[in-house]
């Protein structure tokens, strides 16, 4: 492609809301252009990257035995009403009416239409397993779209749905899709981790996220430095302490005056306590109106997902109000504790492991020291209710846990019959009986992975793409292209030779100043830069630069061809 035949729309202007590097560089490089809040035009260079990602995804899905189809983007309300998601989705569902006043929505996801298609066409176990996928534009009316295409309202996604007679068949396809997602991300060239994840609103049983490692990632993931254990922080757990090794304390409880101390941090600072000897007592109210005292170590944080999954809790829970707490304890938050606690206690394992702990006295401006479980507090339950922290022992006992940030680009689920059962998507099984098909669901954020790639690899000058998805593999940058016949002749021949070799190449024939050409090439992120100028050309040389390493070499064209091949 010649630069004059496409649209290179680099700019120095940035809107204030462009906070993430990926958002800034995609706008500056002219890859996208904002049309409305959370809605972007894919410019030629951006679309080229997007198409390369789509091609990798499509190639690996086809290799895995999946078949591509395309579902409508506009969905009738009747389908989502069958699964009760017409109302459950809330305001993120963009609803509309046609001229006959029938209700439709712009598809935020496509479980219902794929099940509708399957129940009309799949009748027997003999047609299974079947894995169908599409690459489709979706729309979710985010209240605050931000971070460019990372969290846009309109986005491009590959979503696949598999159908099965039994759980083992489903698990086999799930494992195939797990490996396929690894292949996709390996082929793109990104550093990532698959992690165990919560199924969330989609539902189902088994679930994994595929997280691209990046400092700007909104998700926190944990992994063991001694094994392959990895999980989203929502589900990450740790090796439980051996509570039988607790030392029996001979110290007696002491009540101390702690005026105006309402936080653990202030308590430890003013009273010289070790924060690991303190506990936090937080009061929650579940959906059934039951109150619980949740207890964790002073330096730990509650994990909402784990708490909502407890058998004792009717989800979802909320934090008790200050008024509710005072009516129960006759004390305010910041002074609560486990000694003589008037409500049920659920304590984290790490809190239970403390001997001679410090806690609130259930009386304003007072705390207790030397409180011990089983001696002073006997009515409690133990559960894993906290976020893991760096240094926790991995649950498999191999190594310790480390935390990092990630950007979720893929999520796979074992849905079982979450959608097929309410929609009566039944087959005749091998036993001759009718039963719901079991399903798997496999989502991959095609447009999001593009932003994730930029977040993972960039410098102060622009984007450093993995070569597999760079808009062009090679950029020929001739100085005085429109003024020097010799420069033009060499540049044109090299361009044609590279095209003939199947290399994705851009010839910058705009006649722009060298500084502009070089800056654009760095910003856009072409993988290999070839500068053709009079001085070196007299010696039979060109200047080659590798965008990733920044290494420059003065080499012959023959040597360049060897590098590129």
From Swiss-Prot:
Identify the enzyme class.
ligase
For this UniProt entry, what's an example GO CC term? cytosol
* InterPro entries found in the cross-reference section: aa-tRNA-synt_IIb, aa-tRNA-synth_II, aa-tRNA-synth_II/BPL/LPL, Anticodon-bd, Anticodon-bd_dom_sf, Pro-tRNA-ligase_IIa, Pro-tRNA-synth_IIa_bac-type, Pro-tRNA-Synthase_IIa_type1
* One GO term (biological process): prolyl-tRNA aminoacylation
Q: Which domain of life is it from?
A: Bacteria
Please give the catalytic activity noted in the UniProt record: tRNA(Pro) + L-proline + ATP = L-prolyl-tRNA(Pro) + AMP + diphosphate
Q: Does the keyword Aminoacyl-tRNA synthetase apply?
A: yes
Name the principal localization, coarsely classed: cytoplasm
Any idea which UniProt keywords this protein has?
A: Aminoacyl-tRNA synthetase, ATP-binding, Cytoplasm, Ligase, Nucleotide-binding, Protein biosynthesis
| UniProt EC number | 6.1.1.15
| Compartments where found | Cytoplasm
Family according to the record: Belongs to the class-II aminoacyl-tRNA synthetase family. ProS type 1 subfamily.
What is known about what this protein does? Catalyzes the attachment of proline to tRNA(Pro) in a two-step reaction: proline is first activated by ATP to form Pro-AMP and then transferred to the acceptor end of tRNA(Pro). As ProRS can inadvertently accommodate and process non-cognate amino acids such as alanine and cysteine, to avoid such errors it has two additional distinct editing activities against alanine. One activity is designated as 'pretransfer' editing and involves the tRNA(Pro)-independent hydrolysis of activated Ala-AMP.
Check the record and name the PANTHER family matching this protein.
MITOCHONDRIAL RIBOSOME PROTEIN L39/PROLYL-TRNA LIGASE FAMILY MEMBER, PROLINE--TRNA LIGASE
Q: Could you tell me which HAMAP family the record lists for this protein?
A: Pro_tRNA_synth_type1 (MF_01569)
Domain notes, please? Consists of three domains: the N-terminal catalytic domain, the editing domain and the C-terminal anticodon-binding domain.
**Which NCBIfam families does this entry report, sorted A to Z?**
PRK09194.1, proS_fam_II
What's the protein name?
Proline--tRNA ligase
